[in-house]
């Protein structure tokens, strides 16, 4: 049986994909994965991915940290004979009726795992995407009679997503983070240890700050400026030298991302202040050459500086507008 795990392009999508890949492989499944190219494929599952999976005789698609809004895409997958399992934590899409009531829409997958479903009795609703994937893995391991301790080991990765997804650190999120930090400080993962070395954390205690401001951004930089597959390969790498090469590459990418963000923000501030835009109710700034993957970061920094809603546009976005894309 061929299974493809399909990830949301982010650090939490990378983590979800990694732990699902490890777990499914442990259950003797034939697993491959797909993390989209941010520029070419955008976010989430799309028609081309589904058709390619069908052409490759894939049996099951499992989404990681996405899929709850992919109504049409999952319908297509079912029409093509694929089974679909959705693991997601995002809000359930809905249609608001004239009377103000809401009709919630769930994709017609074979299994849709999301604690925010209105018909879900799971008591904790604020899991991150990797947390939802972990809960799926726990149940999977029970079905395959795999020791619970093996699932618990995966919390060292879930902890990264808990911090970087900025979910509330309460209830299960806090429990997962606490246990994950214990595990990650004694990790045997060659890729993580290489990243600790590359970022100057080797021999130091890994804490919430380390995850949120050093490890997380380094993993995420590959998705922002290159391809998130690099981060996933790092976590899967078993050769120390190759892992260190990948870790160094990710660390350098993150430094590049920081510098590009700094330059973009400085340019945006110059535009705003030279045009007296700080009196506007909404700040809309066009930065022609800024990398589209950091436009959102710059917009956030502008919002923080001026305490106003901010939108940053760049060349690719304007090209889409000119082509009729809203």
Where are these regions (language model features)?
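Active-site cavity-forming subdomains of large catalytic enzyme subunits
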Residues: 54-126, 130, 134-143, 153, ...
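Hydrophobic helix-and-loop "lid/oligomerization" segment in the mid-to-C-terminal part
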Residues: 1-60, 80, 98-100, 108, ...
């Amino acid at each position: 049986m061929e299974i493809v795990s399909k990830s949301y392009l982010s650090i939490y999508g990378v983590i979800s994909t990694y732990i699902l890949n490890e777990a499914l492989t442990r259950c003797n499944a034939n697993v491959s994965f797909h993390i989209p190219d941010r520029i070419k494929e955008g976010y989430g599952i799309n028609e081309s991915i589904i058709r390619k999976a069908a052409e490759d005789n894939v049996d099951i698609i499992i989404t990681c940290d996405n899929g709850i809004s992919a109504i049409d895409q999952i319908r297509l997958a079912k029409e093509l004979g694929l089974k679909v399992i959705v693991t997601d934590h995002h809000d359930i899409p809905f249609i608001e009726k004239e009377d103000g009531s809401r009709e919630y829409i769930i994709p017609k997958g074979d299994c849709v795992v999301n604690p925010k479903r209105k018909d879900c009795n799971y008591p904790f609703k604020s899991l991150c995407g990797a947390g939802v994937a972990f809960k799926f893995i726990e149940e999977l391991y029970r079905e395959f009679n795999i020791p619970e301790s093996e699932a618990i080991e995966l919390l060292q990765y879930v902890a990264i997503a808990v911090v970087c997804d900025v979910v509330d650190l309460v209830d299960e999120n806090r429990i997962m983070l606490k246990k994950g930090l214990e595990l990650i400080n004694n990790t045997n993962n060659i890729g993580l240890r290489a990243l600790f070395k590359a970022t100057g954390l080797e021999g130091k205690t890994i804490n919430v700050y380390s995850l949120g401001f050093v490890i997380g951004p380094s993993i995420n930089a590959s998705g922002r400026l290159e391809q998130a597959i690099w981060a996933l390969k790092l976590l899967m790498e078993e050769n120390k030298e190759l892992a260190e090469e990948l870790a160094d590459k990710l660390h350098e990418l993150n430094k590049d991302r920081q510098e590009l963000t700094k330059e973009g923000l400085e340019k945006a501030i110059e535009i705003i202040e030279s045009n007296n835009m700080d009196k506007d109710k909404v700040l809309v700034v066009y930065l022609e050459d800024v990398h589209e993957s950091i436009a959102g970061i710059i917009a956030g920094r502008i919002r923080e500086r001026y305490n106003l809603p901010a939108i940053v546009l760049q060349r690719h976005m304007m090209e889409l507008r000119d082509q009729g894309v809203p």
